[in-house]
Swiss-Prot record:
The lineage of its organism: Bacteria, Pseudomonadati, Pseudomonadota, Gammaproteobacteria, Enterobacterales. GO terms for biological process: 4-amino-4-deoxy-alpha-L-arabinopyranosyl undecaprenyl phosphate biosynthetic process; lipid A biosynthetic process; lipopolysaccharide biosynthetic process; response to antibiotic. This is Undecaprenyl-phosphate 4-deoxy-4-formamido-L-arabinose transferase. The chain crosses the membrane at residues 236-256, 270-290. It comes from Escherichia coli O157:H7. The keyword Transmembrane applies. Belongs to the glycosyltransferase 2 family. PANTHER family: UNDECAPRENYL-PHOSPHATE 4-DEOXY-4-FORMAMIDO-L-ARABINOSE TRANSFERASE (PTHR48090:SF3), UNDECAPRENYL-PHOSPHATE 4-DEOXY-4-FORMAMIDO-L-ARABINOSE TRANSFERASE-RELATED (PTHR48090). It is found in: Cell inner membrane.
Length: 322
């Protein structure tokens, strides 16, 4: 029987990248939600190398009177999950909640996650209801979720939703993992003894545009399999796929022509031989590309470069800056 420790302090970790329009509303609503908890709290906003005015807004928020905002400024853009890991390394709460800055997942859901964590769960995930994304984003998300479930064996419904709560020991365990590329929901579930998902509201994006373009989603899918971004090797795999599909299509066409018009249309089997050859060549390219992905991952991890570089940490005026 494990002792359930009540949540005493909540840390909200929010990565920010070019979100200057949504930041004032985000800070106001997140602060209001945290105040309603009746617990100690802090809000950590990580500027992931924004090129707009986001960093300046964060600094001003941290320096405001009675502020609970901790601003963490990275020197450049490292990506959503690396920015969150940077926030994890500075939290002081015993329950850590992650949240996107676009306000599509309302901060008002935070009390529900805290209440569920108080029931003894190590990880509280969320499933977006009535998603307000494009058809492409919804389809890509479903494909990624299925890929993760097949790869990890963890039957979670929505890995793409970053509105999640983690107990402190889960975050500490993740910080001890040193791989270069990290997908936090998967990593957390590796260490969680008890995990659960709850449905949450999903709103339309009011400010700016999604930071996940088509190519970023493709990269994310590859990273989930190999935990590395190596674009040239991926292009090799793509080339192999095209060749393999082309060879298979030719083979099907030749079979149809042979059955319909006789053996002379298939050049007495010569074209069929080429079709099979192209199929196998394509398969070899795919294998070489995937092998290259893993070799590239090993190379990157061996260099042991840090996931991110924190340029400055600005805490509320009552505390010293780092």
């Amino acid at each position: 029987m494990f002792e359930i420790h009540p949540v005493k302090k909540v840390s909200v970790v929010i990565p920010v990248y070019n979100e200057q329009e949504s930041l004032p509303e985000l800070i106001r609503r997140t602060t209001t939600a945290c105040e309603s908890l009746g617990k100690e709290y802090e809000i950590l906003l990580i500027d992931d190398g924004s090129s707009d005015n986001s960093a300046h807004i964060l600094v001003e928020a941290s320096q405001a009177e009675n502020s609970h905002i901790v601003s963490i400024l990275l020197n450049r853009n490292y990506g959503q999950h690396s920015a969150i890991m940077a926030g994890f390394s500075h939290v002081t709460g015993d329950l850590i909640i992650t949240l996107d800055a676009d306000l599509q997942n309302p901060p008002e859901e935070i009390p529900r996650l805290v209440a569920k964590a108080d029931e003894g769960y190590d990880v509280v995930g969320t499933v977006r209801q009535n998603r307000q994304d494009s058809w492409f984003r919804k389809t890509a998300s479903k494909m990624i979720n299925r890929l993760i479930q097949r790869t990890t064996g963890k039957a979670m419904g929505d890995y793409g939703c970053m509105l999640r709560a983690y107990r402190r020991h889960i975050v500490d365990a993740m910080l001890h993992c040193h791989e270069r590329s990290t997908f936090i929901p998967i990593l957390a579930n590796i260490f969680a003894r008890r995990a659960i998902e709850i449905p949450v509201h999903h709103a339309e994006r009011e400010y700016g545009e999604s930071k996940y373009s088509f190519m970023r989603l493709i990269n994310l899918m590859y990273d989930l399999v190999t935990c590395l971004t190596t674009t040239p090797l991926r292009m090799l795999s793509l080339l192999g796929s095209i060749i393999a599909i082309g060879g298979f299509s030719i083979a099907v066409l030749l079979v149809i022509l042979r059955l319909t018009f006789g053996p002379q249309w298939a050049a007495e089997g010569v074209f069929m031989l080429f079709a099979v050859l192209f199929t196998f060549i394509g398969a070899q390219f795919i294998g070489m590309g995937l092998l290259g992905e893993y070799i590239g991952r090993i190379y990157t991890d061996v260099r042991a470069r840090p996931r991110y570089f924190v340029q400055q940490v600005i805490r509320p005026s009552s505390k010293e800056n780092e």
